[in-house]
Amino acid sequence: MTALYIDADACPVKSEAERVATRHRVKMYIVSNGGLRPSQNPLVETVIVPDGPDVADMWIADRCGTGDVVVTGDIPLAAKCIEAGALVLKHNGEALTSANIGNVLASRDLMADLRAADPFRQGGGKSFGKADRSRFLDGLERTLRKAATLG
């Protein structure tokens, strides 16, 4: 049976994911190292993991599999989940697959090297807007339908 795993630390689409999961009657796990208000929705389980690097990521990677959906902005976690057979979406609705994860990992590593080479660089990524939320909702809807046929 399909489950939805949310890497909740710094995830801007938790409430949107909950609405879609509820509509599909899919169990949703919101995984974090704390600081989240638990949902009253019986389909949503808030999982609080101990503090530490990548503890939430390991919890998700150890449990997801074929027919499950993972929402994360963490590219190494996405790679592990894809390897386990899960379908993976970024917060903006972009699907990460076995066909594109290698390039995404390489781009991530290149950007990390470029940031490290320029200690005076300021600013971050672009802001997360309505269009991103809309793409996420559409992507999650399609991905959950696909996952239902796999698991």
UniProtKB/Swiss-Prot annotation:
Belongs to the UPF0178 family. NCBIfam families: PRK00124.1 (NF001095). This is UPF0178 protein RD1_0321. It comes from Roseobacter denitrificans (strain ATCC 33942 / OCh 114) (Erythrobacter sp. (strain OCh 114)).
